[in-house]
């Protein structure tokens, strides 16, 4: 959430910065301006009324010594003035509540280092690791490979849960567990503390990281009141862990990694990635989260990006890093890098991680702070990134590591987690006859 005082003091600057995101961001900010002006008026009026109240109190004390007959009339005037103060305070409270509601749907202004642009076509490739492998055959997409190997099952999953769900069988299920363990081991060796968070959280928790109120249609929630929400990413519970806390500067940065299932309604994604496991209602991910000093968040962002890239480098998967333009960034982010892994069966680079610096945008909502050099509490900066998406790593392994005979070579770092298994070959599983 934006700082109301800062917005009110220089509205045009925020309007100009948000315009880089697109007209929608400017429109979201527009109603704030007249209400901020009304807030200033009410604050001036309240200050004036309280000054008059203090003067009236002093006058009553003086009259009590010099003119007792006039005291009752002065007290009546003071009571009337008190009623006016209460009315002004109530009006101010209403205005501030509405301002908070409005600011909850205004996105984070992009950092100055973010390139201009409207959408994914304006993103900037900043570096590439590895090369596209030359195949002596036409590489297949992962959905064809998974079906031929018998390890990815959609028909039975649809029977259980509908579209955008997948059952992993045999070697694919083992591969998923191996990837998770490998990712966690790499990240903890690089200074992250492992967290296993709750998968159901409150509305306040969802609001803290920016999913609510703007993106409720993308979430799954329970029907009880108040509802609980299934997390769309471990960023939500892990970032909120330190809500209303103050750190000593010496404790920063705080670094966490967390494995969790993620649940997303994928509203607005009809017709996109309907085949395979690229876009699911339920998937697994290892998330990286940091709380940083304000002056160190840019450097910590680059470190987090490198940590996410490291797991892909060790697996030998070809990928590139893309700096998102202002119009393509997520709601809470001030700057985001996407890591895109090469999928030869699809002939495209596909996102496998987003690594974002939210600066103090989330911290203002959850009130997480640290003591600065002067000892005064200062808002922390929050950072998050996929380290990385597990299902999409399976996609990359299936497509990049496929052989002409239809088998898939398992990257060497994962083999110890899979009992030494070196490749995935076709498997046959029991299946009944449909009645």
Curated annotation (Swiss-Prot):
A single cellular component GO annotation: cytoplasm
GO MF annotation: an example: serine-tRNA ligase activity
Pathway where this protein functions: Aminoacyl-tRNA biosynthesis; selenocysteinyl-tRNA(Sec) biosynthesis; L-seryl-tRNA(Sec) from L-serine and tRNA(Sec): step 1/1
GO biological process annotation, one example: selenocysteine biosynthetic process
Reaction(s) catalysed by this chain's protein: tRNA(Ser) + L-serine + ATP = L-seryl-tRNA(Ser) + AMP + diphosphate + H(+); tRNA(Sec) + L-serine + ATP = L-seryl-tRNA(Sec) + AMP + diphosphate + H(+)
Places the protein is found: Cytoplasm
Ligand binding (ATP): 264-266, 351-354
E.C. no: 6.1.1.11
Binding site for L-serine: 233-235, 287, 386
The UniProt record lists the keyword Nucleotide-binding: yes
Keywords noted in UniProt: Aminoacyl-tRNA synthetase, ATP-binding, Cytoplasm, Ligase, Nucleotide-binding, Protein biosynthesis
Gene3D superfamilies registered for this protein in UniProt: Bira Bifunctional Protein, Domain 2, Serine-tRNA synthetase, tRNA binding domain
Pfam families: Seryl_tRNA_N, tRNA-synt_2b
Classification via CDD domains: SerRS_core
Chief place of localization: cytoplasm
Enzyme class label: ligase
Top-level taxon of origin: Bacteria
Comment text on domains: Consists of two distinct domains, a catalytic core and a N-terminal extension that is involved in tRNA binding.
Role, per record: Catalyzes the attachment of serine to tRNA(Ser). Is also able to aminoacylate tRNA(Sec) with serine, to form the misacylated tRNA L-seryl-tRNA(Sec), which will be further converted into selenocysteinyl-tRNA(Sec).
Oligomer and partners: Homodimer. The tRNA molecule binds across the dimer.
Recorded family membership: Belongs to the class-II aminoacyl-tRNA synthetase family. Type-1 seryl-tRNA synthetase subfamily.
Descriptive protein name: Serine--tRNA ligase
Species for this entry: Anaeromyxobacter sp. (strain K)
């Amino acid at each position: 959430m934006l700082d109301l005082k800062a917005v009110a003091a220089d509205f045009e600057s925020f309007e100009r910065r948000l315009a880089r995101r697109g007209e929608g961001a400017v429109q979201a900010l527009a109603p704030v301006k007249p209400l901020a002006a009304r807030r200033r008026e009410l604050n001036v009026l309240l200050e004036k009324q309280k000054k008059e109240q203090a003067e009236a109190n002093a006058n009553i004390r003086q009259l009590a010594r010099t003119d007792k007959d006039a005291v009752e009339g002065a007290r009546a005037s003071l009571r009337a003035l008190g009623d006016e103060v209460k009315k002004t305070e109530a009006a101010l409270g209403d205005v501030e509540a509405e301002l908070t509601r409005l600011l909850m749907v205004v996105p984070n202004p992009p950092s100055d280092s973010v390139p201009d642009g409207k959408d994914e076509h304006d993103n900037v490739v900043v570096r590439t690791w590895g090369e596209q492998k030359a195949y002596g055959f036409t590489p297949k997409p992962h959905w064809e490979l998974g079906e031929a190997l018998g390890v990815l099952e959609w028909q039975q999953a649809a029977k259980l849960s509908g579209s955008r769900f997948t059952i992993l069988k045999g070697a694919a299920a083992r591969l998923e567990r191996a990837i998770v363990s490998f990712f966690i081991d790499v990240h903890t060796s690089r200074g992250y503390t492992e967290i296993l968070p709750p998968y159901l959280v409150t509305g306040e928790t969802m609001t803290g990281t920016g999913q609510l109120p703007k993106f409720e249609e993308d979430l799954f929630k329970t029907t009880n009141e108040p509802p609980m929400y299934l997390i769309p990413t471990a960023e939500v519970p892990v970032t909120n862990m330190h809500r209303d806390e103050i750190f000593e500067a010496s404790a920063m940065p705080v670094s966490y990694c967390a494995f969790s299932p993620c649940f997303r309604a994928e509203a607005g994604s009809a017709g996109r990635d309907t085949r395979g496991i690229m876009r699911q209602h339920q998937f697994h991910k290892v998330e990286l989260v940091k709380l940083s000093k304000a002056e160190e968040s840019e450097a910590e962002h680059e470190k987090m990006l490198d940590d996410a890239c490291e797991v892909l480098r060790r697996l030998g998967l070809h990928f590139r890093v893309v700096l998102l333009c202002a119009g393509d960034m997520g709601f809470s982010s001030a700057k985001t890098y996407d890591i895109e892994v090469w999928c030869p069966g699809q002939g495209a680079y596909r996102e496998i991680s987003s690594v974002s610096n939210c600066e103090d945008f989330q911290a203002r909502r959850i009130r997480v702070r640290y003591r600065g050099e002067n000892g005064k509490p200062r808002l922390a900066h929050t950072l998050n990134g996929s380290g990385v998406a597990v299902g999409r790593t399976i996609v990359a392994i299936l497509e990049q590591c496929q052989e002409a005979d239809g088998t898939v070579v398992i990257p060497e770092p994962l083999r110890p987690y899979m009992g030494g298994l070196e490749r995935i070959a076709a498997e046959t599983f029991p299946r009944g006859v449909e009645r």
